[in-house]
């Protein structure tokens, strides 16, 4: 949630009536649907593999978490992010019982890189590519008749920023139903940037481990159908959205600010009308980078205080890689599945937690089984764009 708006339903200190999630969809390196992704994560399966999309000889790092859908090894094609986005939205809409005509439904998309990979292939290699294909709205209009399409490029918290806007639209009466999605794919430029800033090239993502070396990117898309709570009669409810809080602390271009992250946690709890001790599960941002994991752990320690060891915690980027703008919404879908099933995926590769997180209840080894009601989902990005959501289990 952003700063207070003028209408009472969106006042920053007023808990919102929960909106309901009535459909979910996802595709990434560990699965082709939301249910398949969750099953893979609970089994501890990782999408990590040798880099396939471009020439490994140009980089120190040699691995990534890619969707293996290219026509031939070592080659790449345009439009992959758009195809995954459409696929995730199709699944979520089908799950919600919506038809193919989404002309009346706002679609809000969070992305860090959009179709930058297609632009790279077009500009450098001469691949056939029309500039209109950079915009997801073109494909969504053609496939679903969508005309109210919004794109948010807020780095790694983009899809939760989109969720905040979608929540505000519902609260303000601008729509009864919205679709919120997130998507990103590996690009050579971003992979190269990360390859240069790491002191040592990481071979896997190991969030909160003392020996972590950095982040590796992953492909993926996620989507949910969100409906106002008072208009959800007859819907099969996946879970409740209690709050989304966003801020931009502007602390540094890339380094996180503990105070800014902590403010986002406090804001999400306040808007949800809950206390830190009420949270049963934390879906960590957990990128496996030196600064980010430390800052996230310190912020949680400050906000949760004596209760920091209570909730189960996990970081699924250890299996999916960092899916950038889509990662926050993927975390939310996993959180909803965990609340519903009582299963929490493990953090793969976490052997010895960093000192700042020594008292946390990390899920390690195998998935955990627990009775869960409330989950917190974290997403933080470059420039201090922080977003935190709180979701609740739907009572059957």
List each language-model region with its residue ranges.
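Conserved active-site "lid/cap" helical segment
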Residues: 3-5, 10, 14, 30, ...
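Conserved catalytic cysteine-centered active-site region
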Residues: 5, 13-16, 49-83, 114-167, ...
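Structural signature of cysteine-dependent C-C bond-forming condensing enzymes
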Residues: 8-13, 95-108, 138-148, 171-178, ...
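Cysteine-centered functional microenvironments
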Residues: 18, 25, 121, 147-164, ...
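Condensing-enzyme catalytic core mediating Claisen C-C bond formation in acyl metabolism
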Residues: 18-22, 27, 34-35, 39-62, ...
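Conserved small-residue
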Residues: 21-23, 41, 89, 107, ...
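Conserved active-site and cofactor/substrate-binding residues in soluble primary-metabolism enzymes
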Residues: 32, 36, 76, 80-87, ...
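Short, well-ordered beta-to-alpha junction loops that form the rim of enzyme active sites
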Residues: 110-112, 182-184, 380
């Amino acid at each position: 949630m952003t700063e207070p708006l003028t209408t009472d339903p969106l006042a920053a200190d007023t808990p919102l009536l929960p909106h309901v999630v009535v459909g979910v969809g996802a595709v990434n390196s560990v699965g082709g649907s939301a249910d398949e992704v969750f099953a893979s994560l609970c089994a501890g399966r990782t999408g990590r593999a040798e880099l396939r999309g471009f020439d490994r000889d140009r980089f120190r790092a040699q691995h990534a978490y890619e969707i293996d859908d290219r026509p031939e090894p070592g080659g790449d094609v345009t439009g992959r992010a758009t195809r995954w986005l459409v696929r995730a939205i199709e699944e979520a809409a089908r799950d919600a019982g919506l038809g193919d005509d989404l002309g009346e439904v706002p679609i809000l998309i969070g992305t860090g890189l959009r179709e930058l990979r297609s632009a790279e292939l077009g500009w450098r290699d001469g691949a056939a590519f029309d500039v209109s294909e950079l915009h997801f709205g073109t494909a969504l209009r053609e496939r679903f008749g969508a005309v109210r399409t919004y794109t948010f490029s807020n780095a790694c918290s983009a899809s939760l920023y989109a969720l905040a806007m979608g929540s505000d639209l519902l609260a303000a009466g601008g729509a009864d139903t919205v679709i919120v999605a997130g998507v990103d794919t590996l690009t050579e430029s971003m992979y190269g940037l990360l390859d240069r800033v790491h002191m040592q090239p990481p071979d896997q993502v190991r969030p909160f481990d003392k020996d972590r070396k950095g982040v590796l990117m992953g492909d993926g898309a996620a989507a949910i159908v969100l409906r106002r709570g008072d208009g959800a009669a007859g819907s099969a409810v996946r879970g409740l959205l209690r709050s989304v809080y966003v801020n931009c602390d502007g602390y540094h271009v890339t380094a996180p600010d503990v105070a800014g992250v902590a403010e986002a946690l406090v804001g999400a709890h306040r808007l949800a009308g809950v206390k830190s001790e009420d949270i049963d599960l934390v879906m960590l941002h957990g990128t496996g980078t030196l600064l980010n994991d430390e800052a996230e752990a310190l912020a949680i320690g400050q906000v949760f205080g004596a209760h920091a060891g209570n909730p189960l915690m996990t970081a699924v980027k250890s299996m999916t890689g960092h899916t950038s703008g889509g990662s926050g919404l993927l975390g939310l879908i996993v959180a909803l599945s965990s609340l519903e099933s009582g299963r929490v995926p493990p953090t793969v590769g976490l052997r010895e937690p960093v000192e700042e997180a020594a008292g946390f209840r990390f899920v390690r080894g195998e998935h955990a089984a627990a009775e869960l009601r409330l989950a917190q989902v974290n997403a933080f990005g470059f420039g201090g764009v922080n977003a935190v959501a709180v979701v609740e289990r739907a009572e059957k």
